[in-house]
From Swiss-Prot:
Signal peptide: none
The protein's name in its UniProt record: Small ribosomal subunit protein bS16
HAMAP family: Ribosomal_bS16
Cellular component terms (Gene Ontology): cytoplasm; small ribosomal subunit
Domain of life, per lineage: Bacteria
Entry annotated with the keyword Membrane: no
Amino acid sequence: MAVKIRLARFGAKKRPFYRIVVADSRAPRDGRFIERIGQYDPMLPKDNKNRVVVKADRLKHWLSVGAQATERVMWFIKKGIVDLETESKKIEKKKVEKVQGQEA
């Protein structure tokens, strides 16, 4: 089963609203999904913090277990809208501090 992280379209006609979901690649675009990990509202202004909302820990989990992100979701990640690197740097920093504390 190939798992994809993709956008599912909701909302009214000419008022799109997207949910960022983890779904089987064979499932319909707006159909059955495994987990909802965020949302994207293109109708909000670009500087609005609620335009793209993602559970970064769940996104990171699904990417680590082999889920493939679609082109648009990867664009969000590369643009820095979804900040995965900051989360991983915080975790690494805590691990380094913990190891140094044990050695001392």
